[in-house]
């Protein structure tokens, strides 16, 4: 009887860990003897993957924010290189996490000649530079989640398949506002704003003080206002709660459950990233925030070539949802916008209608195949 295939999967952040775990569950259901190892977090571990490193707890972004963790990332990189050399997997699956995974792809292809699938494309459409040439030289197949990404790779001569966006299916089964409030134990008849500062430590440190001050200003106008704060699994809950202590605010903290928190809210303030797209797909009135270190901001101004930061705005190619970035990310601007937004009933209606059209455009896009089918097609026949 032939040996089962070996697959190594690398997901360095919580969202990628979650998406990768869903793939592993599907693979294990059909190929129970498949040997899967790699880098991931609690979701991949729960799915039965043998982990050699967990980088999800060190979620950072930016030039200066990463410095304290360089030794950790270097060790993880050396460990996964050694693991690949020893295991010689039939397939290497890289999930998002481009700063780490593109370097790994270059090594795995050049030194080991491994077959590589890259799921969730680096934002080559946002960054100036020549990342796409590295991808063309290293990756056997790109599995992209936005239709326009397929065109970019096809034009560059990179093998690519559009596999659909994982959030579309996830959001389709989300609870409505009433059910979400009941599920979370929130009052049904009070105004609620969800505050989502991000899942990285640097995002917590920069965003939460601004969100606390914004909440205080909004509460001055509406003392009945309640806030709900979902806390990512990568963050110590006590650290988040400490910012809100003795602030005379009505706040409910929820471990995880970000989608339910957004669904339960009347309005959402969300850090740019995956959660902002989740919020858009929920058709929830919102605004997007982001603040980085000065050095990261200056570098971004030089390298980034897109007009918007929020994924929903990028997809719509217009400012559908307001973005409060860097120096504009402050409690004065935020509280002023939110107060004006709710004083005009036409503004929420208009935003909801635009978000509904965006959701429809993503939902109606026909995927070439599923990620599962793409992976299975690249596995040796010995798994059958």
Curated annotation (Swiss-Prot):
Keywords for the protein's UniProt record, in alphabetical order: Glycosyltransferase, Lipid A biosynthesis, Lipid biosynthesis, Lipid metabolism, Transferase
Highest taxon of the lineage: Bacteria
Pfam families, A to Z: LpxB
Matches recorded under SUPFAM superfamilies: UDP-Glycosyltransferase/glycogen phosphorylase
Pathway: Bacterial outer membrane biogenesis; LPS lipid A biosynthesis
InterPro entries: Glyco_trans_19
GO biological process terms on file: lipid A biosynthetic process
Transmembrane segment boundaries: none
EC number(s) per entry: 2.4.1.182
Keyword set includes Lipid metabolism: yes
A GO-annotated cellular component: membrane
One GO molecular-function entry: lipid-A-disaccharide synthase activity
Family: Belongs to the LpxB family.
Family matches, as PANTHER family: LIPID-A-DISACCHARIDE SYNTHASE, LIPID-A-DISACCHARIDE SYNTHASE, MITOCHONDRIAL-RELATED
Biological function: Condensation of UDP-2,3-diacylglucosamine and 2,3-diacylglucosamine-1-phosphate to form lipid A disaccharide, a precursor of lipid A, a phosphorylated glycolipid that anchors the lipopolysaccharide to the outer membrane of the cell.
NCBIfam families reported for this sequence: lpxB
The protein's name in its UniProt record: Lipid-A-disaccharide synthase 1
């Amino acid at each position: 009887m032939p040996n089962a295939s070996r697959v190594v999967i690398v997901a360095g952040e919580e969202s990628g860990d979650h998406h990768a775990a869903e793939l592993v569950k599907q693979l294990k259901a059909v190929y129970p003897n498949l040997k899967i190892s790699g880098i991931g977090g609690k979701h991949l571990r729960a799915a039965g993957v043998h982990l050699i490193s967990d980088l999800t707890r060190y979620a950072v972004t930016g030039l200066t924010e990463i410095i304290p963790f360089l030794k950790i990332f270097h060790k993880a990189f050396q460990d996964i290189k050694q693991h690949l050399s020893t295991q010689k997997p039939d397939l290497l699956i890289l999930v998002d996490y481009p700063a780490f995974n593109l370097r790994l792809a270059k090594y795995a292809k050049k030194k080991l000649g491994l077959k590589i699938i890259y799921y969730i494309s680096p934002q080559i459409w946002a960054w100036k530079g020549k990342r796409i040439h590295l991808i063309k030289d290293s990756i056997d197949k790109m599995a992209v989640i936005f239709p326009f990404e397929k065109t970019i790779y096809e034009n560059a001569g990179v093998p690519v398949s559009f596999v659909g966006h994982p959030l579309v299916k996830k959001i389709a089964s989300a609870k409505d506002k009433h059910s979400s409030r009941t599920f979370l134990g929130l009052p049904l008849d009070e105004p609620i704003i969800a505050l989502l500062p991000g899942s990285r430590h640097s995002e917590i440190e920069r965003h939460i003080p601004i969100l606390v001050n914004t909440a205080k200003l909004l509460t001055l106008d509406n003392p009945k206002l309640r806030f709900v704060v979902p806390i990512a699994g990568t963050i110590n809950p006590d650290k988040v709660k400490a910012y809100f202590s003795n602030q005379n605010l009505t706040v409910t903290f929820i471990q995880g459950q970000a989608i339910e928190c957004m669904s339960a809210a009347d309005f959402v303030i969300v850090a740019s990233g995956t959660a902002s797209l989740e919020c858009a797909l929920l058709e929830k009135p919102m605004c997007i925030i982001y603040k980085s270190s000065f050095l990261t901001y200056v570098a971004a101004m030089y390298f980034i070539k897109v007009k918007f930061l929020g994924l929903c705005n990028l997809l719509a190619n217009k400012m559908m949802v307001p973005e409060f970035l860097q120096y504009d990310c402050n409690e004065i601007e935020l509280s002023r916008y939110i107060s004006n937004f709710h004083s005009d009933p036409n503004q929420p209606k208009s935003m909801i209608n635009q978000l509904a059209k965006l959701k429809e455009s993503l939902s109606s896009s026909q995927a070439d195949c599923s990620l599962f089918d793409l992976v299975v097609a690249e596995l040796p026949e010995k798994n059958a």
